[in-house]
Amino acid sequence: MDKHTDVVIVGAGPAGLAAACAARSCGLTVTLLDEQAAPGGQLLRNVESPLAQALMDPREREAGLRLVEDFRGSGATYVPRAVVWGMEGRCLSFSVDNVPQRLSAANVILAPGGMERPVPFPGWTLPGVMGAGGADILLRSGGSLTADKDAPVVLAGNGPLLLLLAGHLLDAGVRIAAWLDTGSLSQRLLSGAAMPAALLDPPYLGKGLRMALRVLRGGVPVIRNARDIRALGADSLEKVSYAAKGETRELPAAVLLRHEGIIPRVQICNALGARLLWDRVQRCWYPDVDANGRTSLDGLYVAGDGAYVHGGDASRLKGWLAGIDAARRLGVISPAEAGRRAAGARRKLAVLRAARGFLRYVFAPDPKIFDVPDETLVCRCECVSAGAIRKAVAEGFHEVNEVKRVTS
């Protein structure tokens, strides 16, 4: 492998693949590093596998296959099973099959995608409790959640991924005992102002409606305004407890799938010192980037859901814009040529971002989900409870690393 490249991309999801295609179309040398064994990221995981294809929306499947095909034919250097563990300036340290390597680049495009919002709750460490994203990965990889399809599965939380997962579970013949909806009613009421913009993207709204109808037709009981969710059991999950309409109730469950939305992966940006911004509605940090994904650090871009969660279609466009701008930055193409190549993607992205603003409120997390009992484990590795963290903050330790030091 070359020790230097024009562009190194981290992440082979829709944004990373599109960025590679865009940069290569301008003649740049490109190396793409990804920890998975095949391209696609989380959204298009195993898209080249017939098993995964069977679970995907036909339009997304065909678009994903075309994107992967374009990437494989682009001439970019593809390094699967690469774990990036260090970055100094624009020099990356990574390992492939436990062999350390280094690679420098004139431009770095981070495309880490999004991650499930971590929300601890009583009993979340019990066997049988999973995140919705992990469950969907298991299904796409040919696994099953339970040995018995009639074993009750409970969904809990808020977010479009739960709609998608519910459809996949129903298609697989899994019995969904209930969906405990934890969404914020007040924020959903605020979404009305953004509804007209959402109408600019009928296919996306149509997809959401189809997923919702699939859940309704599947007879899944939806319990609104569920609070105080707890996983109960001795050695593994046996029941799920929740509060609704002033009463506490229990449901038998073999599996509990919890999900409270997708947020950007900002760990690398944060470690590098790139400027971050706070979203008060979605209650998450995201990188401060311009229209092309440029961060506050020279030569560092963030593309896709790692910049802000707008979904797969928007991620492709963000990746394309970052790849084109990387070529402009190196002087390989003129600003005018960059503008011409980016114009179509900009127009489409503007529509998608406006439409996604509606979902920002519809699937906003309710702050009450973070109000967990003191005995709730927050860090299972160090056995740190919510109460220990609150005690540290009350004693004046307000910086994250300080809290980690005094509670570990």
Predicted segments — roles?
Residues 1-407:
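Residues forming the flavin
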